């Protein structure tokens, strides 16, 4: 049997991925392992990857250090993923998520509005 690279990470640009981030697109579990040996040096193999799901990261999203993105995750645009977060499922656009499992704690549009107000006051 042979290993083939099986991964897919879609993004639309402007994505920042910090250090030590792990993005998983498969779980490398086995349905069946090596089954039998017919003759000396001849093996019959039944290796199959159990699951494969690509990851999608929306434009202008930021993924903090040490975050883990699990297979099949879809991160919306303008999202912030907190450092060390474990992310699974669909993360809506403009979400700020943290934790294990991650939870939405805020909205980047609110953060942007506060930043703009402070910038104008300076």
Q: At which residue positions do the language-model features occur?
A:
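Short-chain dehydrogenase/reductase
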Residues: 62, 80, 96-97
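Hydrophobic alpha-helical segments of small multi-pass membrane proteins
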Residues: 16, 83-86, 96
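Beta-rich strand-turn-strand
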Residues: 65-80, 85-89
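Flexible, glycine/small-residue-enriched loop-and-beta-strand segment within the central core
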Residues: 1-74, 100-101, 107-109, 114
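Acidic/histidine-enriched, glycine/proline-rich intrinsically disordered or flexible terminal extensions
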Residues: 115-122
């Amino acid at each position: 049997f042979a290993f083939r690279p099986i991964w897919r990470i879609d993004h639309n640009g402007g994505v920042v991925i910090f250090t030590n981030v792990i993005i998983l697109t498969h779980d490398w579990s086995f349905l069946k392992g090596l089954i039998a040996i017919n003759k000396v040096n001849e093996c019959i193999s039944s290796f199959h990857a159990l699951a494969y799901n690509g990851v999608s990261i929306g434009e202008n999203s930021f993924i903090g250090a040490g975050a883990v993105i699990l297979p099949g995750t879809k991160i919306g645009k303008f999202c912030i993923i907190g450092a060390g977060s474990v992310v699974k499922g669909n993360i809506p656009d403009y979400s700020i998520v943290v934790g294990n499992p991650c939870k939405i704690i805020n909205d980047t549009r609110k953060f942007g509005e506060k930043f703009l107000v402070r910038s104008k006051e300076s």
